[in-house]
Amino acid sequence: MKIIVSLIIFTIFLSSVSAAKEKIIFKFTENELSELKVRKVRGADAKTIYTIGKNENGNYLKAVADNAASGLGKEIKIDLDDTPFINISWKVEKDLKGIKENTKKGHDFAARVFVIKKTGATPLSNRAINYVYSSNLNIDDYKRSPYTKKSIDYVLSTTKNNFDEWITVKANVKEDFKKLHKLDVKELDGVAIMADTDNSKMKAISYYQNIYFSSE
């Protein structure tokens, strides 16, 4: 009887370990911030300002884009067969109401998280899904970037529903690549964060916390 009980407990333990599989992407520390790759958008007047803060849930990243555009990127391998879901906690304090985000003149978002798959020798050949916190579009709206067909904007949150409050969202990246790019991606090559207002010439303020991939 003791052997049976032990086997049951062991099976439950294995199940809980499997269900808890996670891969943390950003720690949001000062040291990490200094090491992340900063990419200024070509033609932007200034860089987005990124700073580290802390609340009851741990460290977070604050982004202030005032007629500015630059992103923070990390090259990291993510096994999408193992952990296909991206989880993001974020907040928009100042949004970009009134712009047309799916046009070249209005292609700005208060908060974005890119997931990137290398598909060629140069960055221009990469495929990306740009998960965005929109100020004007609806959740689950998606469209190819007006600047490149290889990046698709996908709305996970909108200030029409959640403004100036923390919200946590989840997306199945593996399935989204199949749906949006017609690609069966087994491994990602990088993740990036950006807040940008270089097209609208406006100001946006956003926050990021607890960005990780999970098995479910």
State the predicted function of each range:
Residues 75-86, 160-163, 184:
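Extracellular/lumenal carbohydrate-interaction signature centered on repeated Trp-anchored short motifs
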Residues 50-71:
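Short carbohydrate-recognition loop motifs
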Residues 106-151:
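Extracellular/luminal beta-rich ligand-recognition
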Residues 6-13:
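Bacterial N-terminal signal peptides
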Residues 108-113, 149-150, 156-159, 163-203:
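Extracellular beta-strand ligand-recognition surfaces/modules
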Residues 20-43:
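Extracellular carbohydrate-recognition regions
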Residues 89-95, 118-120, 174:
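Solvent-exposed strand-to-loop "edge" motifs in beta-rich extracellular domains
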Residues 28, 191, 209-213:
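Extracellular beta-strand elements of beta-rich domains used
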